[in-house]
Amino acid sequence: MTFYNEFFKRLQRLMPSNVKPKFESDQDLLAWNQEQGRLSSESILRENKAMKMQRVLGRSGIRELYMNCSFENYKIEHDGQRKVLKAAKRYAEEFNENIASFIFSGRPGTGKNHLASAIGNYLILHGKSILIVTVADLMSNMKGTFSGTSNITEENLLHNLSSVDLLMIDEIGMQTESRYEKVIINQIVDRRSSSKRSTGMLSNLDHRGMKNLLGERVIDRMRLGNSLWLTFEWDSYRQYVRGDEY
């Protein structure tokens, strides 16, 4: 405390009389410094979690095509796209206020990945840790933990997947529908909802298809909080994507 007391006194002597100091006492200065240290530590911890998971899962995360996706460069041609854009943007802006998850379902090439990446990019800019992973990559890395040369266990991987602020699982329904895959997805959703962390899912399946694939238990947990289910029903516009739009 002596350091802060002496520092504060010197600061007061050097400061012009017409300038009001930000801190009224050395205790205020100490409290501010401790708070900044806490915020910095939390930020580093979040970044380390995301980096650790991206190292483990290799080519996961926001892919190059979607790295510059935002709400601003999402193309709107009709009311359906306007509706999903508004809802996705609101979800990102209100992320801190609830534990809601989301499901984007519908036809391929309709903008599900764009808006999911826009949510991810928005949250990264606001200090959150996010991870996008396909089911294929997820299961490949899960099965890789059984290898005798793996330096991470299945439990370690499940724990890390449950620790990022937002986990988005892509290509739900393109897998082989094995029992192990259902068990793993169920465990991930269960752990994340129990720890009040949100999960996003992207799929070409409709509501009935998702329920049949994952089971009522998983779908029910995805409804926690002010959850979001958006349906992308229009034609694909991938044929018009050049790669330099974003």
UniProtKB/Swiss-Prot annotation:
Disulfide bonds: none
GO annotation terms (biological process): DNA replication, synthesis of primer
Molecular function per GO: ATP binding; DNA binding; hydrolase activity
Pfam families for the chain: IstB_IS21 (PF01695)
Entry annotated with the keyword ATP-binding: yes
Gene3D superfamilies noted in UniProt: P-loop containing nucleotide triphosphate hydrolases
Enzyme nomenclature, EC number: 3.6.4.-
Identification of the protein by name: Replicative helicase loader DnaC
Organism: Buchnera aphidicola subsp. Schizaphis graminum (strain Sg)
